[in-house]
Amino acid sequence: AVLYNSPNFGSRTSLSNGKNAAFAVVLLLSLLIYGSRCLSQRNHLCACGNNHSSH
């Protein structure tokens, strides 16, 4: 049972680590896109800051 469970457990942990890494990459990309979009609109930078403070 131990020999059967250990490779299965290893594959599951690596799979969950891959999912976590992919989620982190997507989160960072969305933050970068949001930040660049906010900075590209210089006249709306104040409104963007107000949204952050209210949130």
Swiss-Prot record:
The keyword Ribonucleoprotein does not apply. It is found in: Host membrane. Pfam families: Plant_vir_prot. One of its GO terms (cellular component) is host cell membrane. It comes from the Viruses. It is a multi-pass membrane protein. InterPro entries: Plant_vir_prot. Its main location: host cell. Keywords: Host membrane, Membrane, Transmembrane, Transmembrane helix, Transport, Viral movement protein. The chain crosses the membrane at residues 20-39. One of its GO terms (biological process) is transport of virus in host, cell to cell. Belongs to the carlavirus/potexvirus TGB2 protein family. The three proteins TGB1, TGB2 and TGB3 are required for virus movement. This is TGB2 protein. It comes from Potato virus X (strain Xc) (PVX).
